[in-house]
Structure formats: C-alpha cells, structure tokens
From Swiss-Prot:
UniProt catalytic activity: alpha-D-glucose 6-phosphate = beta-D-fructose 6-phosphate
The UniProt record lists the keyword Acetylation: no
Enzyme Commission number(s) from the entry: 5.3.1.9
Name of the protein in its database record: Glucose-6-phosphate isomerase
Gene name for this UniProt entry: pgi
Organism field: Leptospira interrogans serogroup Icterohaemorrhagiae serovar Lai (strain 56601)
Enzyme class: isomerase
Length: 445
C-alpha cells in the first residue's frame, strides 16, 4: 500500500484549516463513485483493473511476441496520454544500458513533437534495421503522430513491400476514425481504445499495455498493482487514512495558502518519465477556469545544482511531493583508496544507494527548514507492480482533486487553442480566413 508521509510538512499544516479540505475531498470521492460528477462519461478507468479480459491480455501478449521476434527496433507513435504512460513504465523498469537485438528490441518513441532533425535521424537510423510500429491514436488525425506515421509507413513499405502491414499494430477506435479505416484497409492487427477512458487515464488500456508487452515487461504484474491498490483506496472512507483522499486534501490546502506550484521530485533518474506522465495527468485535469496547481518536476540530486537554489531561498509559492521507493539498488559499495585524494574515504563501506538516501533526507530537511512543505509518497520499489499501484493512486487522487476544485477533471478544452492557430497558419482547408487574420497579427508584432 502506498503511504503518504507528512513528517517534513506537518509544521506547515493547521488541523483546523485542513479539516474543510478533508471533508471536501471525501465528498469529491463519493461524487466520483456516484458517476454523477462532471465528465461522468469518461469513468471507464475507475473500475478497469477489475474488468480487463484475460482473452485481450493474451492476444496482446501474442501479438507483442510476434513483433519482438521479428524486430530489432519497435517505434511507438503517440503523443500525450498515448505514449507518456508506457514510456514512464519502460524508462523506470528497463536497464539503462542494453544492446538491442531481434527478440529483445529497442523501443523508440515518435510522434510526440514535430522537430525535423529528430525524424531525419530516426529514418536514417531505421533504414538498416528490422523494425515495426505501434501507432496509437483514437482518431488518426492528431497532427504529430499522424505525420510521424506517414513518414515511417513510407519507410516501412519501402523496406518490406507488401509485408509491411504485418509490422504495424494500430491502437485506435473500435469502429470509426481515419486510423481505424486505414487499419481495416491494410488488415492490420488492432487494439481498441475504450470510448469511456480519456487519454491521460489510459495507461491500463492497450494504449499503455501493448508497448509494455513488446518491451518484454510483465503486463500481468503491472495490472496486479492496479488491482491491489483499488481494493484498498475504494473502501477507506476516513480521508486521513486514505492516501489518495489525503493527498488531494493537502494539495488543495496548500493551494489555499498561496502555494500554487507542486514539484514532483525524485532521486532516481529512472523515474523521470513518471513525473512527465504525472504532469500531463494533473495539468490537463485541473488547469482550467483559471484554477489549478501548476505541476512541475525535478530530478534530484541533478536539479539541486540548478533549481535547488530557488527552492531553498526563492519565493514561497510551492510545495514538494517526493517519490520515495523503499527498496533501491544498493549493490555498489564504495571502496577506500590509499591516497584519499578526493577525501571520500569517509564513505568507504557504504553503498551508493545509502549515500543517495542520505542526500534525499538531507534535502527534505533543508527544504522544510527553508519554508517548503515536503510530502513523501512511499511505495515498495521500482517494479511494474509498484508502478501500477502508484499510477492508479495518482489517477484516483487527480479525479478527487479536480472535483474538489469544482472543475471537470476529464476534459481538456484549452488544448484546442494552439491546434486551431497552427491549422490556420498552415492553410488547412476551412481555416483560410483565420490564417490571414493571424498572419496580420504576427506581422504587426
């Protein structure tokens, strides 16, 4: 079970002021389970860990194994919730350094930006390698992944001719959309994105599960993590004992105290993309109607040598939540040297994991002393099962926190603003008039 520790934040919390936020969080949790809140049509994720079909899991595993056995590289194409969840788990659990091969392929991501050098070098990199594609898009028309798939499909056809289709798996809508139409015409293997699950809550659908399977990660253990924590946090009604409700209450309490930035920090570089996934989850869910906490992330101890100064002595507008796995790799022991030129012999006999843990504790003490409340999210280890628990904890907390704020945590209307302007500037049919207006504005500036 995930624990939320407040030992480095308790001095910033007044019980009498926190109480209304605890009550509001529990009320929001009940609203979530009543299926009567805003965005109720997108609650498919809530009970999904109990509803997954073994037949679908087996089919994903079989198709993934086929791609693994024919590919040195598998390119996962998607943006936002279509790639961040799987990338978070892959980056956290796969070795930092490995030599890819057929049967043990390298996983590369594309379609999450529009930078031309990246695509030019990716195409060149793939030209002499056996590769396959998992393209993920509900509609098939999202600009970034659509462009990526167009470019890589062209290369795939050039390399493999009529057999190219056997190297593409599409994760898309069950019955409609451009990608679904293309998949049917090319007879691609397909997996379905449920209509009642939004992108940022979709890591337990084929959106997240299939890329894990092609990477060789046990999706059954990942699913087990979701199932285990669901049974706990759905049943605990005391908001001080339910870590998800408590986290939601504390976040909104700190917001009311003028702390409108939350820093999700980690002391393990493998957790960096967990933070990236978390930023989308909370940013898109809460950042609307001029409300919400701004989600930021930092990688320690690296960022202590850049942003650490601001946290220690800058404007007191933030609080920290620190990802704290209980078990970390500790098999590297520091040995003494005869001359001790670096003056590090005092560390001899200690593992590097122990040194990193003392850095974590020292940082939390320093930041709390500097006026920054620091929460700790304690979970067992960095494994697929523990990450499953952590991700469901965040999804559940985010929905509760959004309802507590009075916003719909399942839509993202503001995302369309940049798309509309981009389409107009690119002369997309139907946007010509807006394009002229925007170009005039740009020229005046």
């Amino acid at each position: 079970m995930i624990r939320l520790e407040t030992r480095f934040a308790s001095s910033f919390i007044q019980s009498s002021k926190l109480e209304p936020f605890l009550e509001k969080s529990e009320s929001a949790r009940l609203t979530l389970h009543s299926s009567q809140g805003q965005g109720k049509e997108y609650l498919g994720w809530l009970y999904l860990p109990k509803e997954l079909k073994n037949s679908e899991i087996e089919r994903m595993t079989q198709v993934a194994e086929r791609l693994r056995n024919s590919s040195e590289v598998i390119v996962v194409i998607g943006i936002g919730g279509s790639y961040l969840g799987s990338r978070a788990v892959l980056e956290a659990t796969l070795p930092f350094f490995k030599k890819p091969s057929i049967g043990n392929p390298e996983i590369i991501f594309a379609g999450h930006h529009l930078e031309s050098r990246y695509f030019s070098e990716l195409i060149e990199y793939l030209e002499d390698k056996n590769f396959s594609i998992n393209v993920i898009s509900k509609s098939g028309t999202t600009t970034e992944p659509a462009i990526a798939f167009r470019l890589l499909w062209e290369l795939l056809r050039k390399k493999y001719g009529s057999s190219a289709s056997s190297r593409v798996v599409a994760t898309t809508d069950s019955s409609k959309g451009v990608l679904k139409k293309f998949a049917d015409s090319e007879k691609l293997d397909t997996f379905t994105i449920p209509d009642n699950v939004g992108g940022r809550y979709s890591v337990l659908t084929p959106v997240g599960l299939f890329p894990l399977a092609v990477a060789g990660i046990s999706i059954s253990k990942f699913i087990l993590g979701f199932q285990n924590i669901l049974n706990d946090i759905h049943s605990i009604t005391d908001p001080t004992r339910n870590p998800a409700t408590y986290y939601s209450a504390l976040r909104n309490y700190f917001l009311s105290e003028g702390r409108y930035i939350e820093v999700l920090a980690n002391f393990n570089p493998s957790l960096r993309y967990v933070s990236e996934w978390w930023k989308q989850l909370f940013g898109e869910s809460e950042g609307k109607e001029n409300k919400g906490i701004f989600p930021a992330s930092m990688d320690f101890t690296t960022d202590l040598h850049s942003l650490g100064q601001y946290i220690q002595e800058g404007k007191r507008i933030l609080f920290e939540t620190v990802l704290s796995p209980s078990e970390v790799c500790s098999n590297l022991t520091l040995k003494p040297t005869q001359d001790n030129l670096d003056s590090l012999n005092f560390l001899s006999g200690n593992t590097l994991g122990y040194v990193n843990e003392q850095a974590r504790l020292g940082t939390l003490l320093a930041h709390a002393d500097g006026g920054v409340p620091c929460l700790e999210l304690v979970f067992p280890d960095i494994s697929p099962q523990s990450l499953g628990e952590l991700m469901y904890f965040f999804e559940y907390s985010c929905a509760i926190s959004g309802y507590s704020l009075g916003v719909n945590p399942f839509d993202q209307p503001g995302v369309e603003a940049y798309k509309k302007n981009m389409f107009a500037l690119l002369n997309k049919p139907g946007f010509e008039q807006e394009g002229e207006t925007l170009r005039k504005r740009i020229s005046r500036n």
